[in-house]
Amino acid sequence: MKKQNVGNACGWADRLARLLLLPALTLVLLCSCDEDKAKSERPEEGDQLWKIVPVLASESDGFEGLGEYGVSLYLFNDMSSDCYKYQHADSFGDLEPFVVEKAAYSLVALMMDRDVPHVFYEASDEAKKNTTVTVTDMNETIPDMVLGTASVSRNVGATVPVSDLQRLVGALDVRLTDVPNDVTAVELTVGDLYDRVDLTGQYDFSTGEPASKRIELTKEGTVFSARSVLMPSDETRANVKMDFRVFRGDAYEDFVVRLSGSIPADKLTRLEGRAEEILKNAELTLGLTYAPWDASITIEDHFQTDDDLNKVWSSAPLPIS
């Protein structure tokens, strides 16, 4: 009888343990199912990412060769003025896609036909939206520079056309004809110029004062001429100052030209005149007209002088910054 009682007690203990274990197993299974369901409803990491492929918009056809320019590409998150991602490539076709979280962004592309040490800008993801591009030596050859932008929102496709193209520089053609044989050299200093522009296309002066650019004209027989890319002039001024320095051996004379208007970006201006007019001791006043970047114009085939031909001009060196 005692053995039987002991056996029954053990059986009841075993059944009791099983009954206590069953709710715990059920709870574990339910939690496991809920966790699996949550995982299935949670988006994969790839669904949170977005590939942005920058391309030049079709309107870039008006900018010959732009696709082969070196490009610095900045990606800004619209919630911040800080650059989120940056890359540089030798041409637009060499750019890599940006892979980022889905959000609202803006692309800014700075394109130049060549890299030069005297054009300084922040070429990294340390850039800001108001980061500036500064020409540190205006007398050196200035490259063609074009700014392009694009807005990027969540509902666009992967390919993002960079449009809103803005050429940041202008060009000036100068041609003096019928130059006297004893003239050995001619220099032109164009004043009232900007030397800095930011990534939004706003110009200013790095020193707080207008800059200038010296251009040496090339002699071919009795013609002195030059073509130069330059930064635009201060649009708040009524005219542009041009100082011609005419050399006869080591001696020189200075002549001042005031051009009505401004020298704009994205325009080509051709200034042509007979040297016998400009070499008179008088202040010259001309009106500027403009043409597209890939065209040229002639303002006049001679220079107009004012009535006072008795002005005395200093031969002191001109300030060239």
Q: How does the language model describe each region?
A:
Residues 29-32:
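C-terminal motif of bacterial Sec signal peptides marking the signal peptidase cleavage site
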Residues 39, 52-64, 176:
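Short amphipathic, basic-aromatic surface patches that mediate peripheral association
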Residues 91, 114-160, 250-282:
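Structured interaction patches on ligand/partner-binding surfaces of diverse proteins
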Residues 162-169:
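Conserved "repeat-terminator" motif of extracellular CCP/Sushi domains
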